[in-house]
Amino acid sequence: MTKIAFTGGGTVGHVSVNLSLIPTALSQGYEALYIGSKNGIEREMIESQLPEIKYYPISSGKLRRYISLENAKDVFKVLKGILDARKVLKKEKPDLLFSKGGFVSVPVVIAAKSLNIPTIIHESDLTPGLANKIALKFAKKIYTTFEETLNYLPKEKADFIGATIREDLKNGNAHNGYQLTGFNENKKVLLVMGGSLGSKKLNSIIRENLDALLQQYQVIHLTGKGLKDAQVKKSGYIQYEFVKEDLTDLLAITDTVISRAGSNAIYEFLTLRIPMLLVPLGLDQSRGDQIDNANHFADKGYAKAIDEEQLTAQILLQELNEMEQERTRIINNMKSYEQSYTKEALFDKMIKDALN
């Protein structure tokens, strides 16, 4: 029986692809295990949503693009992580490693290479992240979500596969969504998602604009951990820090979304044909990958995008109003998108690429 080790973490985006793939792997008769950090979000998500597979925590450092004394400490954490990962891989003897990226993945990929275990990397963003750039030297193949990403990668190692979307995405129950929120079925629903870390600025602007927004929408506000404001209570407005199992039901009642521009999330909105206003993480908080993703989706006619630095209460309302006027055009553009690979076909390709 083929055994696949999965790794990736640090953000929800670095875990969600694995969460979508592992159930398919298990249903096809593959064995699966997960290697991640000791305290990262990946541990919480994998252990709670896939308790049937083994989770192995390892030491991990953070990859920084700036000079810091912490970089020296993290070198030792990465070295320890390589040793930790080697122990796991020697014990489990997987046939291949699938790496979604994030800083925890680098020591695992290096350890796999030292044991001659082939690695397949997945890159969700338009431009490759630092972890995947490093890991690519030790990997056999890298799969991309965006076809344009191939321009940044060695031709012999890179293949475009499109987005991988979790199976339950389209199974959301609108009735359950309305019951959860207590919303009126005859009024539009706006979903606001600030990413796994939340966005204090976006949260502030939503609350500042709440009365105006509630004239047109009912609002589901995913604030991020620790960012709920218990003092804000209005009819047609509900806050959650983070939603797991119920998210598909909330998406089933969503008409419009305001969101960060992580690749996995925006491809889910695209699959569901939900018009989106994207507010990507700025260069002060990231390497600019979300800016690239947002601009790409805007250019394709799937979304509208605005830089967080330019975001004001007035501009938010203006952009939403313009998007509502273009709603039919946006949804028609979304209908042209087709998924490149089924998950079953992707695993066939993965096994062939890794083991041949």
From Swiss-Prot:
Keyword Cell wall biogenesis/degradation belongs to the record: yes
Keyword DNA repair: no
Molecular function via GO: glycosyltransferase activity; undecaprenyldiphospho-muramoylpentapeptide beta-N-acetylglucosaminyltransferase activity
InterPro entries the UniProt entry points to: GlcNAc_MurG, Glyco_trans_28_C, GlycoTrans_28_N
Source taxon at top rank: Bacteria
Pfam families per UniProt: Glyco_tran_28_C (PF04101), Glyco_transf_28 (PF03033)
GO cellular component: plasma membrane
Pathway in which the depicted protein is active: Cell wall biogenesis; peptidoglycan biosynthesis
Main subcellular location of this protein, as a coarse class: membrane
A GO BP entry: lipid glycosylation
Catalytic activity: Mur2Ac(oyl-L-Ala-gamma-D-Glu-L-Lys-D-Ala-D-Ala)-di-trans,octa-cis-undecaprenyl diphosphate + UDP-N-acetyl-alpha-D-glucosamine = beta-D-GlcNAc-(1->4)-Mur2Ac(oyl-L-Ala-gamma-D-Glu-L-Lys-D-Ala-D-Ala)-di-trans,octa-cis-undecaprenyl diphosphate + UDP + H(+)
Binding site for UDP-N-acetyl-alpha-D-glucosamine: 166, 196, 290
Subcellular location per the Swiss-Prot or TrEMBL entry: Cell membrane
EC annotation from Swiss-Prot or TrEMBL: 2.4.1.227
Membrane topology: Peripheral membrane protein
Enzyme kind, highest EC tier: transferase
CDD domains: GT28_MurG
Function comment: Cell wall formation. Catalyzes the transfer of a GlcNAc subunit on undecaprenyl-pyrophosphoryl-MurNAc-pentapeptide (lipid intermediate I) to form undecaprenyl-pyrophosphoryl-MurNAc-(pentapeptide)GlcNAc (lipid intermediate II).
PANTHER family for the chain: UDP-N-ACETYLGLUCOSAMINE--N-ACETYLMURAMYL-(PENTAPEPTIDE) PYROPHOSPHORYL-UNDECAPRENOL N-ACETYLGLUCOSAMINE TRANSFERASE, UDP-N-ACETYLGLUCOSAMINE--N-ACETYLMURAMYL-(PENTAPEPTIDE) PYROPHOSPHORYL-UNDECAPRENOL N-ACETYLGLUCOSAMINE TRANSFERASE 1
Family named by the database record: Belongs to the glycosyltransferase 28 family. MurG subfamily.
Protein name: UDP-N-acetylglucosamine--N-acetylmuramyl-(pentapeptide) pyrophosphoryl-undecaprenol N-acetylglucosamine transferase
Record lineage: Bacteria, Bacillati, Bacillota, Bacilli, Bacillales
Gene name tied to this protein: murG
